[in-house]
């Protein structure tokens, strides 16, 4: 009898753990991340048939520059959004992060005037063709980074999961669509900017 009661208690304990909000939220985020990764892996062989290696190189350079600018602009303040006990402190950090992001976006927009020189610096002449998209990329992806941690603070994990999946689907579909439409040189870069915009709009809707 005692053994049965112990087994029952353990079963109830495991059930309560599984049903706990923390585990559910973790599972939700993990599932979304796995789905997003699988989508990327599935479409990659298709993309390699559409785009040339230099197209992937140009995309990686564009994303690398943009991501470094985002890190420099927000200075990791958005990581701290989950820490304050008082809502007003979190709001103040959010405003500071957004202000820094906007200032950086303006500076990046000004740097578009020197896109030719920047492309020479990185030894990638074609970068100048698409560098005008950089301010939009910095603003959109940087804005999501801030919003992401705001969602974490408010336990809006469903919105984070939705963004991850929609982002992956839009990136995959957009790259394939742009490729078949003939936008081979910049198709993936255009998609890298448009997909975050649409995903961001979806997450706040």
Residue map of PLM features:
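Short membrane-interface helical motifs at transmembrane helix boundaries
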Residues: 6, 106-124
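Hydrophobic alpha-helical transmembrane segments
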Residues: 61, 128-135, 161-205
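Signature of the first transmembrane helix
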Residues: 18-75, 103-112, 168-172, 196
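Helix-loop interface residues and adjacent transmembrane-helix termini in multi-pass membrane transporters
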Residues: 50-53, 124, 154, 181-182
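N-terminal membrane topogenesis motif
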Residues: 1-39, 79-82, 92-94, 98, ...
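Cytoplasmic helix-loop-helix junction between adjacent transmembrane helices
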Residues: 144-164
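Interhelical loop/hinge segments that connect adjacent transmembrane helices in multipass membrane
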Residues: 5-22, 158, 185-189, 201-205
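Helix-loop junctions and terminal segments of transmembrane helices
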Residues: 71-89, 152-153
């Amino acid at each position: 009898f005692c053994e049965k009661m112990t087994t029952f208690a353990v079963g109830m304990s495991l059930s309560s753990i599984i049903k706990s909000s923390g585990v559910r939220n973790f599972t939700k985020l993990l599932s979304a991340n796995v789905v997003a990764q699988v989508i990327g892996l599935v479409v990659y062989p298709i993309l390699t048939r559409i785009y040339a290696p230099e197209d992937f190189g140009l995309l990686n350079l564009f994303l690398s520059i943009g991501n470094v600018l985002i890190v420099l602009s927000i200075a990791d303040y958005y990581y701290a959004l989950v820490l304050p006990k008082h809502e007003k402190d979190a709001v103040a950090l959010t405003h500071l992060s957004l202000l820094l992001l906007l200032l950086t976006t303006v500076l990046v927009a000004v740097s578009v005037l020197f896109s030719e020189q920047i492309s020479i610096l990185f030894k990638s002449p074609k970068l100048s063709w698409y560098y005008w998209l950089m301010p939009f990329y910095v603003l959109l992806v940087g804005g999501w980074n801030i919003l992401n941690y705001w969602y974490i603070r408010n336990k809006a994990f469903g919105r984070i999961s939705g963004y991850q999946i929609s982002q992956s689907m839009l990136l995959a579909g957009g790259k394939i669509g742009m490729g078949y439409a003939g936008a081979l040189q910049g198709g993936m870069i255009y998609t890298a900017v448009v997909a975050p915009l649409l995903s961001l709009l979806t997450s706040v809707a």
